[in-house]
Amino acid sequence: MATYAIGDIQGCYEPLQCLLEKIDFDTAKDKLWLVGDLINRGPDSLATLRFLYSIRSSLEVVLGNHDLHLLAVYFGLRKQNKSDTLTPILEAPDAPELIHWLRQQKLMHHDATLGYALVHAGIPPIWSLDKALACAREVEDYLRGPDFKTFLAHMYGNQPSVWDDSLQGQERLRLITNYFTRMRFCSADGELELTTKENAAAAPPGFAPWFSFMQRKTRQDRILFGHWAALEGQVSTANVYALDTGCVWGGYLTAMCLETGALVQCACEA
């Protein structure tokens, strides 16, 4: 039995199959942890989502910004962007089933036995692991509940940009979502900078990669994340593992075995 964490797939079905063949994945005994952005921008989003749904009992999934965007588009709360490749999913006869499954997924997963946490973008330096899990549950409960469309309709936006425990309602949910699904750079007190998408060296004044702060409350916790392709999987911070290696941009799709730390990759075509 093995557990593999896989970076952003983004509808790249063939590299995913290549990777599963390389690791000799067995649904009967192995598990996959997926860092989110399962779909969008790649060539085979529908095939990817259908396949993942078919092996759902072997998966732990956290949602990425593209997955949440699909939900908003599907429910008519947002229009597709020019770079989106979501139409085949939206028009699929099994779309309601796939979308319902996606809506049940997490923003954060933690396995104390394996000793890893899984998120799409990151955890702000001001949150402990328990605080992050509690905040993730707030959004997950809303997304799974009867009023989920209200959340999706108010999800977009860059404000508020800094955490305050007194935040309430949709502003609170939006900031939690931005931390988990959009964050790259922030300040030591958790203020988000959502404009810069280049590598760590491009940090604007006063900001740094979320994982780089000495006083970060999760420094002793092992965190797997995706989202930040410009890092090319390179992080010089202990206990932090960047798994988005730019598959959809012609890079690689990466899997990491949680039991051994071994990396396996398949090359992708842009």
Curated annotation (Swiss-Prot):
InterPro entries: ApaH (IPR004617), Calcineurin-like_PHP_ApaH (IPR004843), Metallo-depent_PP-like (IPR029052). It catalyses: P(1),P(4)-bis(5'-adenosyl) tetraphosphate + H2O = 2 ADP + 2 H(+). Signal peptide: none annotated. Its EC number is 3.6.1.41. Keywords: Hydrolase. It comes from the Bacteria. CDD domains: MPP_ApaH. GO terms for molecular function: bis(5'-nucleosyl)-tetraphosphatase (symmetrical) activity. HAMAP family: ApaH. Hydrolyzes diadenosine 5',5'''-P1,P4-tetraphosphate to yield ADP. Belongs to the Ap4A hydrolase family. This is Bis(5'-nucleosyl)-tetraphosphatase, symmetrical. It comes from Cellvibrio japonicus (strain Ueda107) (Pseudomonas fluorescens subsp. cellulosa).
